[in-house]
Amino acid sequence: MDYKNLVAERIKENTELEVDLIEKLIEIPPKKDMGDYAFPCFQLAKTFRKAPNLIAEELKEKINKEGFEKVVTVGPYLNFFVDKTVLIKDVLEKVLNEKEKYGSSKVGEGKNVVVEYSSPNIAKPFHIGHLFTTAIGNALYKILSFEGYNCIGINHLGDWGTQFGKLISAYRRWVDEEALEKDAIGELLRIYVKFHEEAEKNPELEKEARLNFKKLEDGSEEETELWNRFKDLSLKEFNKVYDMLGIKFDSLAGESFYSDKMDAVVQEIDDKGLLVDSNGAKVVMLDDYNMPPCMIKKSDGATIYATRDLAAAMYRKKTYDFHKCIYVVGTPQALHFKQVFTTLKLMGHDWADDCKHVGFGLVKLANKKLSTRNGDVVFLEDLLNQSVEETLKIINEKNPNLKDKEGTAKKLGIGAVVFTYLKNNRERDIVFDWKEILSFDGETGPYVEYSYARGKSILRKAGELTGEADYSKLSSKEEFELAKLLGGFNDAIMNAIDKLEPAMVTRYVIEVAKAFNKFYNAHGILNAEDNDVKLARVKLVEATCQVIKNALNLLGIDVVEEM
């Protein structure tokens, strides 16, 4: 039984409000002794022409209370206490019947959602900052897919621009082929940095680089061959990280893909009378929207990011007819996307309202213990590998006889890092601290994983239990609170979709783990007072494990069965 929906239906019977609106207004009371659901009656004051607290009293008398233990008023709120036995039975049966599908729905059926995320620059380091966009985008992709949306995951690679002209010049002068084979990104970064050092002494290098890129734009075989090599070498390195994270994309259409589509976009902007000359550059004026102009072409005629993003948005709408197009890109780019979306609207594309920028913060290291390859950039692959190594040390200390220690350390170590990136509001900065991230206490990935493994250990020891569970035996506060929390999984997912915030699921699974451990510490499970209680509690453990697994999977984190 969906109690939130039941509350909404009962209120609808006595008001003119629609169920969808009522569900959005329903709150969870701040204290557990105040009830399970609360409806604020302020919304009805105009319709009923009475004070909200009087409306609450009247509704309490009229409302059908079947399925609830009681309905009470708390000032202007109408508070509902659910029938605990019915709720526990309904939730556990639903979880155990639906298993890996529990929490899913068909709410997004028939709707396409484009998610652009990760998007590293070719020939540049895949550093720890990139995990923000990669982890958030992957989680949103999984969450939306779980609710029936048809998602298209796009890795919008930074694979075009004048920097490739510079890289071609640098490659021809200074590349060490042996180093390139061993550490492609490191070597490409080295020669790119050297180019900038040398260009300060010799400005002719910049001219040469521009000529190289012009040749690349014109399809020169030699330049194109080098560009493809840089791209292939980079993707080979990037794929090591994607494989570690278990991430795949539906499209790798990066900036270069739109290079032949931008002239048509510029022409359309011009045809709409939006293109203005500004010191030789071509811009769209956005003064009426309190924004600086959106630059479309630089004074030398080159297109920039905005032009490419306009071309990409138009191509995606035409190709995928998206319901939403989500851009998981750092918060500093917020103005850029506002300019792009506003320009699309001015061009007459009202679907620009369906384009959403999902920003995120920065990542900082609490200390400098993580070595860097070039002194200032922390490569993501190195971070993940170090996390696995540190986790293996902890496992060797805590459980040296564990089977498949390396496999467990890999899942735990990588999962701990991803969990940290997804734990708090995405716009908050992360301070990366190994001690906290890999701790088995507190609000961490290992704590949630340990809770799951503890539950699975109980289930293995319990073996096959026969008979039908009598859920009325689950009469304690801890059992009810855990079951009620399990019943709220879909609400957490829908909140994550509404706010485009995976942390709603991360915070939820932390609360499930906490509630499970409270229950575990308060009650005997395998040594329960009788077999009926034992069976009911084992079923509660089984349902909890299922929900934790489902939630972690949505976050892109593998569970470990044993620790």
Curated annotation (Swiss-Prot):
Main location: cytoplasm
Gene Ontology BP, a term: arginyl-tRNA aminoacylation
GO terms of molecular function: arginine-tRNA ligase activity; ATP binding
Domain of life: Bacteria
Record has Nucleotide-binding as a keyword: yes
Keywords: Aminoacyl-tRNA synthetase, ATP-binding, Cytoplasm, Ligase, Nucleotide-binding, Protein biosynthesis
GO terms for cellular component: cytoplasm
InterPro entries, per database record: aa-tRNA-synth_I_CS (IPR001412), Arg-tRNA-ligase (IPR001278), Arg-tRNA-synth_N (IPR005148), Arg-tRNA-synth_N_sf (IPR036695), ArgRS_core (IPR035684), DALR_anticod-bd (IPR008909), Rossmann-like_a/b/a_fold (IPR014729), tRNAsynth_Ia_anticodon-bd (IPR009080)
Catalytic activity: tRNA(Arg) + L-arginine + ATP = L-arginyl-tRNA(Arg) + AMP + diphosphate
Membrane spanning residue stretches: none
Location(s) in or outside the cell: Cytoplasm
EC number: 6.1.1.19
Entry keyword Transferase: no
UniProt short sequence motif 'HIGH' region, positions renumbered to this chain: 120-130
The protein's assembly and partners: Monomer.
Family membership: Belongs to the class-I aminoacyl-tRNA synthetase family.
Annotated protein name in UniProt: Arginine--tRNA ligase
Organism field: Clostridium botulinum (strain Loch Maree / Type A3)
